Structures are given as C-alpha cells and as structure tokens.
C-alpha cells in the first residue's frame, strides 16, 4: 500500500520497486494534493516508473468535507489544475463558509469552543498562534491528511503562488469536517 503517492519522486518509486519485486501495489494518491505539481495522468506516471499492469479506480464521493466547504475549495484547485479529480460531497453541514478579518480570530474561536463541548479546531497559516486544548496550529503542509471540526485559514493568499500555493489552500480548506472560516488581514 502506497499512500500519498502523488508526493513520491522517481527515486522514491525506484526504492519501492526494489523492495517489491512483484510490482504489485495498491497506490493511493490525489493529484489535487500534489504540492510540486503533477502534470501527468496516473497511467502515464505509473508506466514511466515501470509499472505495466495498471487498474485504475477514482474516488468520486467525498465523505469528509461538507458541500459548503467544497463549493469554496473546488474553484481554488481548478484554477491551477483544471482536470483535478474533485470528489462530490455527500453531505452538507448547513454552515456557510465564513469570511472575516484576522482581528476576529480569538472571538471566533471562543464562540466555537463555548458552543461545542467536543471537537478540535485548527488554525492554519498563523505561525505565531499558540496551541491550546482542542485548538491546533499548523502549516498547510502539516495539516495534510488530518481533519478538524473547525478549520480557520489565516491569510490563505500568503500560502504561495502557482500550483503549490493553490494545492496548499485546497488541502487546508478540505481539512474541515464541519465549518471553514477564512480570515484576511
């Protein structure tokens, strides 16, 4: 099983091929989350690194991220990767994406913590923010693969330019399982 396969370099693939002479892998990856770009199709990439018998299946259903969040996240990734596989959310949270100023960060967190006895929030993109009980502080890269009830993005346009910046914004947005808040300076 190879997870996050979109991030592997050719050298890393060669290492895996040496350790698995049968060349039988289950490969899981998302081109929309490839920070350093992924211009090939999966078929092209896997053939290029030496795999020949390839059976593909694409995930089309998103169980984690509510429709309200995906409606904001999809255009972000499609602007950089128009053919990205963006799965369809099967549920809504009933909570709209909120846009506010960075000055509202503490107030938004306090209100959420008071209203939610359980769950974890994550502030993404604010390096000076101090973690506390039930509130994490991460970079977009470190948030990859994780999920949080509330995600607060701080100045997401500062996450970078081009494909890498778009991927970081998309990944950060899609960590939300209930609510997304986008704060700008």
Label the model's feature ranges.
Residues 1-2:
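Walker B beta-strand of ABC/ABC-like P-loop ATPase nucleotide-binding domains
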Residues 6-185:
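Conserved helicase motor core of SF1/SF2 NTP-dependent helicases
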């Amino acid at each position: 099983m190879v997870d996050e396969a979109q991030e592997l370099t050719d050298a890393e693939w060669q290492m895996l091929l040496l350790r698995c002479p049968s060349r039988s892998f289950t490969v899981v990856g998302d081109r929309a989350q490839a920070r350093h770009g992924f211009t090939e199709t999966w078929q092209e990439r896997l053939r290029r690194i030496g795999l020949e018998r390839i059976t593909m299946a694409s995930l089309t259903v998103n169980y984690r991220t509510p429709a309200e969040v995906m409606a904001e996240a999809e255009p972000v990734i499609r602007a950089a990767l128009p053919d990205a596989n963006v799965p369809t959310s099967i549920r809504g949270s009933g909570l709209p994406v909120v846009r506010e100023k960075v000055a509202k960060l503490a107030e938004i967190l306090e209100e959420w913590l008071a209203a939610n006895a359980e769950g974890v929030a994550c502030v993404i993109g604010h390096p000076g923010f101090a973690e506390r009980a039930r509130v994490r502080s991460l970079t977009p890269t470190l948030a990859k693969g994780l999920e949080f009830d509330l995600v607060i993005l701080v100045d997401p346009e500062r996450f970078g330019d081009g494909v890498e910046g778009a991927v970081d914004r998309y990944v950060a947005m899609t960590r939300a399982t209930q609510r997304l808040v986008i704060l700008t300076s």
